[in-house]
Design a protein with these regions (language model features):
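Generic N-terminal targeting/processing segments that precede catalytic cores or assembly contacts
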Residues: 2-189, 193-195
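A structural signal for small-residue-enriched, beta-sheet-centric alpha/beta enzyme cores
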Residues: 6-31, 38, 195-202, 206-359, ...
């Protein structure tokens, strides 16, 4: 997922721009986020702490009560408590209870366990333990069949091994098996099944810290859904602000759910993700559907790519030029309407409303065409709040 800047928790030592290697300082979870909620730490940080503790146990015969995990920003470390766990022959085992802070996270309080042993490969080999998922389809930047342990947590775990051994990871040879107690049932309450991750949770995190109810985390999820939607180089996908697009795509296009991305208010960001993913895949998408209510999508005509009502003007203003050009008798209806849904209700059944909505769909498609790259055709379908088709689908 996309990285989010950690809270600064500034100090002269940590932030001195002249310092070549600033001394890492502790990250204080007791400092609340800007929204007044408590931060936590990720499954990736949990697995890293358990890895560090397991190696310490292997080398010293003693399991530490806590370990310090270096965070990816290079400026902070987090002290993480270690939980006792039964030992198994041939392995060193350690567990961490994940603390998600005040974020509504399904993995909050999950027990993340690492089993560690030496191997003769000279490499760190990541293994899937019980309750951690396996990747079954492309688009996640992990090979099919790999454990669902993302790139940043893997690097954090390698670094933790290096810190304990005081040596470069090229000299390491360890099997690191990551598991999660009840992970398979926890994962059913997440989007993992939709993303093609089966059998358990994912080990995630780009900063190591959970920002409660974070906008960046939500946008990072959109980026993942786009990559999964495009992962098998399909002929078409759907972007929609909400459930209308999903209902249309499932009912009329017979598309699998993984090819339907709910972009919420973040139309511009979602289109940028499509462009970037297509470039990564060296793939041209034959058809992109943009489907939803005109209260959101009409704003794209004016180049408004964040459609949240608090951050953008209403859609009625964007529709006025379309009405003036294609259905002049509707202009007064628009001006007298306080919302697009009100306009839809007042003009239903008029002969000139269908060409108006068709022209609106075409205008939205032109706007999207100017934003997205690597797409051969764009089709827009608009619906009222009750699911009634307004334009070409009517």
């Amino acid at each position: 997922m996309s990285a989010k800047e950690l809270p600064s928790q500034d100090s002269p030592a940590a932030c001195d721009p002249l310092a070549d290697t600033p001394t890492p300082r502790p990250f204080d979870l007791s400092t609340l986020a800007s929204n007044g909620l408590r931060r936590g730490f990720t499954t990736g940080t949990s697995a890293t702490a358990a890895t560090k503790a397991a190696l310490t146990l292997l080398l010293t015969g003693s399991l530490p009560e806590s370990v310090d995990v270096s965070l990816p920003d290079g400026l902070h470390y987090l002290r993480v408590p270690i939980t006792e766990t039964p030992q198994e022959p041939g392995w060193a085992c350690a567990s961490v209870i994940k603390d998600g802070g005040d974020d509504p996270d399904q993995t909050h309080r999950a027990r993340i366990t690492v089993r560690l042993r030496r191997n003769d490969s000279g490499k760190v080999v990541f293994l899937r333990g019980e309750g951690v998922g396996v990747v079954t389809q492309p688009g996640l930047r992990l090979a099919i069949g790999e454990p669902a342990i993302n790139a940043v947590p893997r690097q954090m775990m390698r670094q933790a091994l290096e810190e304990v051994l005081e040596t470069d990871s090229q000299d390491l040879g360890f099997d690191v098996e990551v598991g999660c107690e009840n992970g398979e049932s926890i994962a059913l309450r997440t989007f993992n099944p939709r993303l093609g991750i089966h059998g358990g949770i994912s080990i995630l995190g780009t900063t190591g810290i959970v920002e409660p109810k974070s906008l960046a985390s939500f946008m990072a999820s959109i980026a993942v859904y786009v990559r999964v939607a495009l992962g098998e180089r399909p002929s078409e996908i759907v972007l929609s602000p909400g459930n209308l697009g999903q209902r249309f795509a499932r009912g009329h296009l017979a598309l699998p759910i993984k090819q339907i991305v709910q972009m919420s208010n973040f139309a511009g960001f979602s289109l940028d993700c499509v462009s970037e993913t297509l470039e990564e895949l060296h793939h041209a998408l034959p058809l992109l559907w943009i489907v939803g209510h005109p209260g959101k999508l009409a704003k794209l005509i004016d180049g408004v790519w964040d459609t949240h009502s608090h951050r953008s003007a209403g859609a009625v203003e964007a529709l006025l030029p379309v009405a003036e050009a294609h259905a002049p008798l509707l202009v007064d209806f628009l001006r007298d309407s306080n919302s697009t849904e009100s306009f839809i209700e007042r003009t239903g059944g008029r002969a000139d409303v269908l060409p108006f909505w068709s022209a609106t769909e075409a205008a939205i498609a032109r706007a999207v065409e100017g934003r997205v790259r690597g797409v051969q055709e764009i089709r827009v379908r608009l619906f009222g709040m009750d699911g009634t088709a307004l334009g070409a689908a009517a």
